[in-house]
A protein has these predicted regions:
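Residue(s) in the substrate-gating loop at a strand-loop-helix junction
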Residues: 147
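Conserved NAD(P)H cofactor-binding loop of Rossmann-fold oxidoreductase domains
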Residues: 96-101
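Conserved glycine-rich Rossmann-like NAD(P)H-binding loop of the short-chain dehydrogenase/reductase
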Residues: 33-48
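Active-site helix of classical SDR
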Residues: 128, 163
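Substrate-binding pocket helix/loop in short-chain dehydrogenase/reductase
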Residues: 104-105, 109-115
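The beta1-alpha1 cofactor-binding region of Rossmann-like NAD(H)/NADP(H)-dependent oxidoreductases
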Residues: 43, 67-78, 110
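Conserved glycine-rich cofactor-binding loop
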Residues: 10, 15-18
């Protein structure tokens, strides 16, 4: 989809309070999209909403937010079902939530590895699983944010690389399975980016 095609479209943006997610949200707001921001921290969601409202193309735009930890499958399923009823079925789902904690492989605890996988990989799986049944009827777009570190291993980020490599594989398989519903799947693989995460 071209940016201009997002006018009056409904976009669910996960992890849109900083970095790449917020940059995408700003462009969508300026293009006239109705945006549902989803992230864990209410204060950051409020700040992002305030910024996006100043960029909105028209005063009929809906720019709202809800707190959500996408690593929680049940909470994600419940909230997404509620949002579909109150905000509408998304034309696009954009997954930008992620975490990266640099650490040598021998120092990465099971808990850190598990947490990284739950946010970076399972989080995307959880949002897709919750929304796909609703998106199948009208088609749409799913964007998962991986990384160049999902293509090339990076020193000191073994858990992050594992999650991002897996996300690319998941997204490519997803693309082949949902194309019959006219749902497109894109994977972003940005290099080092000047964001709070890096």
């Amino acid at each position: 989809m071209k940016l201009s095609e997002f006018e009056n479209k409904i976009v669910y943006l996960v992890g849109g309070t900083s970095g790449i997610g917020l940059a995408i949200a700003k462009q969508l707001a300026a293009a006239g999209a109705h945006i549902m921001l989803l992230a864990r921290t209410q204060s950051k969601l409020q700040q992002a909403q305030d910024q996006l409202k100043t960029l909105a193309k028209h005063d009929r735009q809906k720019i709202e937010y809800r707190c959500l930890d996408v690593s929680d499958h049940n909470a994600t399923q419940t909230l997404m079902n509620e949002l579909v009823s109150s905000f509408g079925v998304p034309n696009a789902l954009i997954n930008c939530a992620g975490r990266a904690i640099p650490e040598h492989v021998e120092n990465i605890s099971y808990q850190q590895f598990d947490d990284t996988m739950k946010i970076n990989l399972y989080g995307c799986r959880n949002t897709v699983a919750a929304l796909l049944p609703h998106m199948k009827e009208n088609g749409g777009l799913i964007v998962n944010t991986s990384s160049l570190a999902g293509v090339i291993g990076v020193f000191g980020y073994s858990d992050y690389c594992a999650s991002k490599f897996a996300l690319i594989g998941y997204s490519e398989a997803l693309r082949s399975e949902v194309k019959k519903y006219n749902i497109k799947v894109a994977v972003l693989c940005p290099p080092d980016t000047d964001t709070p995460g890096f």
